[in-house]
Amino acid sequence: MNKSMTAKLTQLSVRLEELNRLLSSESITVNLDQYRKLTRERAEIAPVVDLYNAYLQSEQDIHTAQEMAAEAEMREFADAEIRDAKERLVRYGAELQKQLLPKDPNDERNIFLEIRAGTGGDESALFAADLFRMYARFAERQRWQVEIISQSPSDVGGYKEIIAKISGEGAYSKLKFESGGHRVQRVPATETQGRIHTSACTVAVMPEADEIEDVALNPAELRIDTFRASGAGGQHINKTDSAVRITHLPTGIVVECQDGRSQHKNKAQAMSVLAARIRDKQMQEQQSKQAATRKSLVGTGNRSGRIRTYNFPQGRITDHRINLTLYKIEQIMDGDLNELCSALLAEHQAEQLAAMAE
């Protein structure tokens, strides 16, 4: 292990002790935002420090075994212990190198998930609903919370657009590579000739801002309109202008929210989504600049590019960024995304390691 890695790991060990002291303070929960930030930081560095301690213990085990090897009757045992400890040392060292790769500061954040129907008409809207169910089922497996913020149903039962908030540890880290174009090839239920149709949806995964103040929202640059929410009617028919539309004039970003029962709740949710979209736009611009200097397959978050094809007749899903094809479409559409997410993360880490070596 080189000196810079050792220095960084020692620094993290000291910081963990400091965080433990701060989080054990009786007054820490007075500022909940600060408490969340410190808790998130501790959750991020504690596993790294634990791994470093295991690495140091392996070094100590080698030293102890070498001393034992001086005694003839202990030499065979000591040699086996040295081999085992050296294997652990190599394994821990490689893992620590990965752990010290540049961290995405958004990895532990909650997310806003947006799915929009694209080409393909009704079939695209139905696929948007299928994608939402896939992500909702994945969230359920992770014990995350899913809250629909806004939805625009289609006439056939799908969604022209749906926005949801997914809350849970590491939500962004696991789903951040889902942004982009998703193409589906299948025979629609309305197709009488058995022909395969191709349609597409666009997915955007955006990290939630800790506070709306994280994004500079000048009230003078916002146009806020209220209108009557559309719905099924009945006893809960909306007789007031509770739906809210917010337009960010400098960027032209528009957010509508009408799923909440009150104008106050709809406005608060719309502001949260707006802050996330503006922040996401800034991130995309930054990533585009980075992509211009080096090729990145999975880390750009390009919304316009087709990232994945779902071919139902063949039972396969292909991720075009890493040339991965899995013949388990039913399991994946039911929320079994772990293999896909892990493969994309591994490719991203390989790119980071290659960039560090340049």
Curated annotation (Swiss-Prot):
<dbReference type="InterPro" id="IPR005139">
    <property type="entry name" value="PCRF"/>
</dbReference>
<dbReference type="InterPro" id="IPR004373">
    <property type="entry name" value="RF-1"/>
</dbReference>
<comment type="similarity">
    <text>Belongs to the prokaryotic/mitochondrial release factor family.</text>
</comment>
<keyword id="KW-0488">Methylation</keyword>
<protein>
    <recommendedName>
        <fullName>Peptide chain release factor 1</fullName>
    </recommendedName>
</protein>
<dbReference type="GO" id="GO:0016149">
    <property type="term" value="F:translation release factor activity, codon specific"/>
</dbReference>
<keyword id="KW-0963">Cytoplasm</keyword>
<dbReference type="InterPro" id="IPR000352">
    <property type="entry name" value="Pep_chain_release_fac_I"/>
</dbReference>
<keyword id="KW-0648">Protein biosynthesis</keyword>
<comment type="function">
    <text>Peptide chain release factor 1 directs the termination of translation in response to the peptide chain termination codons UAG and UAA.</text>
</comment>
<dbReference type="InterPro" id="IPR045853">
    <property type="entry name" value="Pep_chain_release_fac_I_sf"/>
</dbReference>
<dbReference type="Pfam" id="PF03462">
    <property type="entry name" value="PCRF"/>
</dbReference>
<dbReference type="Pfam" id="PF00472">
    <property type="entry name" value="RF-1"/>
</dbReference>
<dbReference type="GO" id="GO:0005737">
    <property type="term" value="C:cytoplasm"/>
</dbReference>
<feature type="modified residue" description="N5-methylglutamine">
    <location>
        <position position="235"/>
    </location>
</feature>
<dbReference type="InterPro" id="IPR050057">
    <property type="entry name" value="Prokaryotic/Mito_RF"/>
</dbReference>
